[in-house]
Structure formats: C-alpha cells, structure tokens
Amino acid sequence: MGKRLFGTDGLRGQVNIYPMTADVALRLGLAAGTHFRNGNRRHRVVIGKDTRLSGYVFESALTAGLCAAGMDVYLVGPLPTPAIAFLTRNMRADLGVVISASHNPFMDNGIKFFDKDGFKLPDEMENKITDMVLDPDWQWDYPAPERVGRAAKIEDSPGRYIVYLKNSFPAHLTLDGMRVVLDCANGANYKVAPLALEELGAEVIKIGTEPNGLNINHQCGSLYPGVAAGKVLETRADVGLALDGDADRLIVVDEKGTVLDGDQIMALCADDMLRRGALRNNTLVATVMSNMALEVYMKERGCKLLRTPVGDRYVVEAMRREGANLGGEQSGHLIFMDHGTTGDGLMAALQILRIMRERDRPLSELAGQLQLFPQELINVHVERKIPFEQCQPVLDGVAKVEAELGDRGRVLLRYSGTEAVCRVMVEGEDPEQVKRLASLLAETVQKHLR
C-alpha cells in the first residue's frame, strides 16, 4: 500500500492519537499473529513493556489480537527491551513484542517486534504487517475456535534475565568494594538492574527506581546524565550508569563526574577486545552520527570503523553481514554480539565494570584515550519530511558549510525516524566555528523545510 507504520525503532507516537491507539494495536496483533503463524502447532509470543501507564492499554489490545490469530501469549511485565529479545530466544517463542517509547516521555508509547532469534524485524517484514493493518478490507485468516491462543503471566522472567547477564561476567570476578551510581530512569530496569549489580557485590546508589506510570525519563536517565554525575561527585562513587526508559542504551559517568557517550564507551570496549584478541575481523560498527575521532582512533589501531544509517537495528544488520561482534551508537546503544542480539544498557555496563576491575584503573584514565572532535547537534522541528535533494536552498547551505570546513570536518542532515525533527550535525576541529556553522545551517533548514 506504500504507507508505513514503523520508524527506525518500531511504531511510536502519542497515546490515543493515531497510530498509537488501541484499535491499531489490536490490528497489529492480528497482523503479526497471522504473519508468524505457520502450521498447526501451538505458537508462542513473549510480550514485555516498560513502566508507562498506557502499557496496560496496548498490552491488552495486542494480546487480544495475537490470541485471536491463534498465538499463545506470555506476559512478562516491565522488563528491558533486551530482556524480551533474550526471553524470545530462551523460551523458543516465535515472536517477541516490546511496548515502549524508549527515551520519550510518558505520554508517548511504542511497539516493536523481535523474531524468534531475538533480532528486530527487517523493513520488508514490517511492510507486510503494515499492509494488513492498514487495509480495511483485509480478510483475516482466523483459526478455528479450538485453536485460538491463551494468555499467561510468566513470573520468573526477571530472574532468568539476571542469570543471563551474570553469565556474561567472569565467574572469578566480583564488584566487591565498588560504589556504583545507577539511574534507571523510572523505567523498565528499575528492579532488575540494582539487583543484578548487588548480587555481583556492588554498593548501588539508586536513582529513578520508583516508577509511577507517569515519571519515566522525567529529568532522569540517559537524557539527563548530569543527575548521575552530580550523585557520583556527592557520594565519591567509582562510576555512574544512566539507562533510558527501556534500558537498551547507556550513558556512563566517570569518577570525576565527566559524562562519557556511546562513542567513548565503544572506543574503550574496542581497545579491550583488541587486547584480548576478541574483536572479530578488527571491525567496529557505528552509525553516521559517531564522532570522526572514533574513526581516527580505530585506524590508528589498524582497525576499521564501518558506518550505517542511524538506528541500532541497522548496526546489528551490518554486524551480522560483516561478522562483527561489537557495534553501537553515539546515543548509547551498545551491542555485544557474543552475548546478545540488540542494544543492552546493563550488559554494556557489566562490560565496563569488568574492564575497570581487570585493569584496576579509574574510568577517567581508561576512557580518556579518545579525544572527541567538537560536534554540534541541533534538532529542528519540521511539519513535513521533504527529501533534502528537493530543496535547493538547503543543499546550497550544506555545500557552503562543507566548503568552509574542508576535509577536517563534516556535515550531516537526517530526519528522525521517531519524531517530527530534522537533525543538523556539524563536526570539525574549531568548536566556535562548528557552533556557528551548525546554527546557520539549522536556520536554513527551519526556513525552508517547515
């Protein structure tokens, strides 16, 4: 039909405004169930969510649609997105569903799917599901009454996920004596993350672990790393860890209160894996948003940085294609393919804590190897996402900025896959020049793409 429901990270929008409505979710459950039902055996679906109040609405609607399509539904409650990917594999399910809008505020929600192997669905599969949802005349292939699905709650899911996480941490190591500030954004990891770290021996100072359905990501979590940074300095902690609402991304704070983004974390992990001979094909996969300094850093070590479009699903696709086992995004999505299939904030945190413990050095020293180029990112609200090549003034503006930067900088324009926003990014060596050029280009975009 040509229309799309899904962005770079599933379906997302404001609750009770199309397409984030109960009736769309019901049809989405029917469509997904129809698509994944194969043969006469019982089919299984795992559904998890974050802590948003509206999660109950979409959990019920999806469950109704999936059961009507003949799928047995297992409800695991509030759990991180990567936990659903793991449980889908672990429980031999045919499909995993996450109800979350990630780092967005509580009034938004979203729906994304994982296949039986724990990977996000490719575009072509999402498009097939979309066609069924959007076609009002679609003839549903309902199963016989005795073949409709059942729904059941699974109570031990958090424990399964914790065991899985701890299995990625060396058995001979503990976190005894380590003080960790942990900000869970009042989101999906509010129970699991503190418990996992405490079981490994850490002293955990908690932030954002009291969700009420409305406070997810509210002035806490990975979008507000200053909160964790302040607590690190106040408590003299060894490290600060800030997760987002569905806990698939991580921002880290060192013992001096310095915030480290995904690029700096990837550099640290790549260096560690190189030292251990574990970086497969000497390749790190990142997106077009990653800092130029990361590319230089990898080249200096005889390694390759492979860039993809923005979205951890595209990073994962490239990792699978290239045989890489480390990838991520500047925003804090980090994928360790030896352990998981998608971005996992707590898994990434455990890898960093392991490096700190094994090297017995403060994080500021370990992560200080990567000196980032100045980078300015401006989000410009747009009403319509017109292809850039159809707007000559914007193309002229980009060319002008690129000419001034020369080969010591770069420009990137891209539309958000989840918001009505055009992201304007300028990078170079001179911070004042970078800031000035980004502002000029953002003004051009705002004027001609509104």
From Swiss-Prot:
Post-translational modification as stated in the protein's UniProt record: Activated by phosphorylation.
Reactions catalysed according to its record: alpha-D-glucosamine 1-phosphate = D-glucosamine 6-phosphate
Gene Ontology terms for molecular function: magnesium ion binding; phosphoglucosamine mutase activity; phosphomannomutase activity
EC number: 5.4.2.10
InterPro entries attached to this UniProt entry: A-D-PHexomutase_a/b/a-I, A-D-PHexomutase_a/b/a-I/II/III, A-D-PHexomutase_a/b/a-II, A-D-PHexomutase_a/b/a-III, A-D-PHexomutase_C, A-D-PHexomutase_C_sf, A-D-PHexomutase_CS, Alpha-D-phosphohexomutase_SF
Sorted UniProt keywords: Isomerase, Magnesium, Metal-binding, Phosphoprotein
Alphabetical list of Gene3D superfamilies matching this protein: Alpha-D-Glucose-1,6-Bisphosphate, subunit A, domain 3, Alpha-D-phosphohexomutase, C-terminal domain
Annotated positions of the Phosphoserine modification: 102
Binding site for Mg(2+): 102, 244, 246, 248
Required cofactor(s): Mg(2+)
Keyword Phosphoprotein among record annotations: yes
SUPFAM superfamilies according to UniProt: Phosphoglucomutase, C-terminal domain (SSF55957), Phosphoglucomutase, first 3 domains (SSF53738)
The record's free-text note on cofactor binding: Binds 1 Mg(2+) ion per subunit.
A GO biological-process term: peptidoglycan biosynthetic process
GO cellular component: cytosol
Active site: 102
CDD domains: GlmM
Pfam families: PGM_PMM_I, PGM_PMM_II, PGM_PMM_III, PGM_PMM_IV
Function statement: Catalyzes the conversion of glucosamine-6-phosphate to glucosamine-1-phosphate.
Family: Belongs to the phosphohexose mutase family.
HAMAP family listed in its UniProt record: GlmM_B
Protein name stated in the entry: Phosphoglucosamine mutase
Species in which this protein is naturally found: Nitratidesulfovibrio vulgaris (strain DSM 19637 / Miyazaki F)
Gene: glmM
